[in-house]
Swiss-Prot record:
Function: Methyltransferase required for the conversion of demethylmenaquinol (DMKH2) to menaquinol (MKH2) and the conversion of 2-polyprenyl-6-methoxy-1,4-benzoquinol (DDMQH2) to 2-polyprenyl-3-methyl-6-methoxy-1,4-benzoquinol (DMQH2).
PROSITE patterns per record: SAM_MT_UBIE, UBIE_1, UBIE_2
Organism this protein belongs to: Shewanella baltica (strain OS155 / ATCC BAA-1091)
Coiled coil spans: none
This protein's UniProt keywords: Menaquinone biosynthesis, Methyltransferase, S-adenosyl-L-methionine, Transferase, Ubiquinone biosynthesis
Protein name (database record): Ubiquinone/menaquinone biosynthesis C-methyltransferase UbiE
Annotated InterPro entries: SAM-dependent_MTases_sf (IPR029063), UbiE/COQ5_MeTrFase (IPR004033), UbiE/COQ5_MeTrFase_CS (IPR023576)
Gene3D superfamilies: Vaccinia Virus protein VP39
Pathway this chain belongs to: Quinol/quinone metabolism; menaquinone biosynthesis; menaquinol from 1,4-dihydroxy-2-naphthoate: step 2/2; Cofactor biosynthesis; ubiquinone biosynthesis
High-level lineage: Bacteria, Pseudomonadati, Pseudomonadota, Gammaproteobacteria, Alteromonadales
GO biological process: aerobic respiration; menaquinone biosynthetic process; methylation
CDD domains according to UniProt: AdoMet_MTases
Binding site for S-adenosyl-L-methionine: 74, 95, 123-124
GO molecular function, one term: demethylmenaquinone methyltransferase activity
Amino acid sequence: MSEGESKSTHFGYKTVEADKKAELVAGVFHSVAAKYDIMNDVMSFGIHRFWKRYTIEVSGARPGMKVLDLAGGTGDLTAKFSHLVGDKGEVVLADINDSMLKVGRTKLRDKGIVNNVSYVQANAEALPFPDNHFDIITIAFGLRNVTDKDAALRSMNRVLKPGGKLLVLEFSKPQHEIMRKVYDLYSFKVLPKMGELITKDADSYEYLAESIRMHPDQDTLKQMMVDAGFEQVDYTNMTDGIVALHRGYKF
């Protein structure tokens, strides 16, 4: 790349300048933040709760641990982690989008979850935390929105303690052809109409469908985690691979 030539990346199926993607993604989540939880239930038929519950089970969170819920949005995982780590533990709900953080903070405070949770507006590519700080890091349905995923994974590795675990819960690639066809039909024909009906914003849900297709598949993401310094990396497909949970350790 010649000097002065800007880097490009994808925003859904569109090619955009890399330094513009974060702003475009922010616009999506500013738009949908208020109805984000409702849409999660509707568009996944509630199955996202199972995916997240499995993530919590795999995490091995225990009293006294420090947990980073990155791209934590409205705080579903944070709420569960708060109970598991107890008064001597700490959960940081971090998100780059202040609208999502506000919704998450309000929701958790309404549930009485206040003592061991803090909120940080942070870019996953340059996390504002000390080295070797967290026992567990989760990023659920957030990595595909990050401009430089490799930089984000390296940043997560840096702030994770030796012996710590990273869990990446993300949309991925269905494993069977019939599921791929049904999923494509649902994603591109039904999902935007749901978005228009519930949030008055079909475009954001068109972006969602496109961003999922542009996200690395299961094995590619596994290798990206290895390249970022994680060890014993593996993944579990859920709902035929519509979603995958990747796990890796720092030693």
